[in-house]
């Protein structure tokens, strides 16, 4: 009421009006009623996304994890020309790979002019991030990390035409005994073991030496400590290498609370990379026999695999509509089966 007409209202009326206004606009119930809860999207952080892809694909193949630490399994060979591993002379566990043999042989049972050493086992990544690996030698060496090795990767003969995988570091062709360094980088998920193999040889050079180092996330170059090396083998883990946008850590921890155009572009690239990983490993992941050539049967098995992958990714059985959108839609006559699998995986991701 106007100040000059106060007599027109009573204290009871004023109280009733105030209670009504407070209840209608300012009380907790009113604020909740007048400001409905907003639906917000959330997403996986980049670390959780990579872990989800790794777990999803690893679930389709037999996996091995290490049980011991203390170094790598080493086997020393006498070489003979093209045959780098003509005769095994010594097997032992080497805590680290940092040797300077000079003009001597590593063991009395092999000659100093030509020999080879194979170190194999696993390396444990203490944290998630990009790891760099470096090999230093005046001789020849190849380093493989987190790779499913092919027959040719035993590096027994230089004239072998067996299939090889691309080495992370390849210094196989020496340069007149001059010391060289080679390095490579890859993203590893923390808390997991990854297969590691280093093949090294000397052939007629004056001296022999080899050193294996790494640069973990947030750390300097250093020798790989024996505490993270194991003589046991482990299974390669499929890890996507797509670069993700920075996460929001304003609350003290990473959280995925915003879905931007940049994020959509990133997960599209990540989904494409995941489909490539699946295609590379398809026979093993889908359990396809090497002698199976019938297209109808291959298509059926691949569709079953894609449906199983989708169910695991969505954590629920597929209904008819969802199976059509993620699997059946992509397997059409005239389309290569591998391309159909890639499109199905991309749709799921």
Model-identified regions with their sequence ranges:
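Acidic/polar, compositionally biased interaction segments
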Residues: 63-257
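A generic secondary-structure signal for well-formed alpha-helical elements
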Residues: 21-29, 48, 56-64, 127, ...
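Aromatic- and Gly/Pro-enriched helix-to-coil junctions and flexible linker segments
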Residues: 1-66, 234-288, 311-312, 317-319, ...
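Residue-level detector of secondary-structure boundary/capping sites
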Residues: 8, 12, 40-45, 68-72, ...
